[in-house]
Amino acid sequence: MIALTEDKRMLGYGVMTPYSNIFCFATTRRGGFSKGDYASFNCTPYTGDDAESVRSNQELLCNSMPQQPKELVIPFQTHGTKVEVIDEKYLNATSDERTAMLQGVDALITKEPGCCICISTADCIPILLYDRKNQVVAAAHAGWRGTVNYIAGHTLDRMRALY
């Protein structure tokens, strides 16, 4: 992995550098605003972290990207295999509808330019997929339950069915 920020809060995947139309990265716990158990660069709103710290971290994240995303999409993961597509239906949904759509989701797929799909991992595995032909990206959170229950396969199947 290569450092994308001076403080190493964002790391890039060297293997993805040939694909300049997408931006793949991982974040670390460094360089943010959160305190205590969530110190310091926690970007997920589904923890006990201070909401203002999370918003500040998300803003810092977006400002660290080469191009400001239109949308930062973070699901409420449950170590399952639910896959959600971030498309016009999602983008046109109300805030409450979006929250409901992201409940129990461990993989996201999108073809929408400017959408930054996110997953959270600690000791789990991030799976990042890219369909160059159709310009579709996916990110899946693979814990042991998701791995045993084929989250990678479910995500690929959904991508194939839609695109």
Report each predicted region and the residues it spans.
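Active-site microenvironment for binding and transforming phosphate-containing groups
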Residues: 1-163
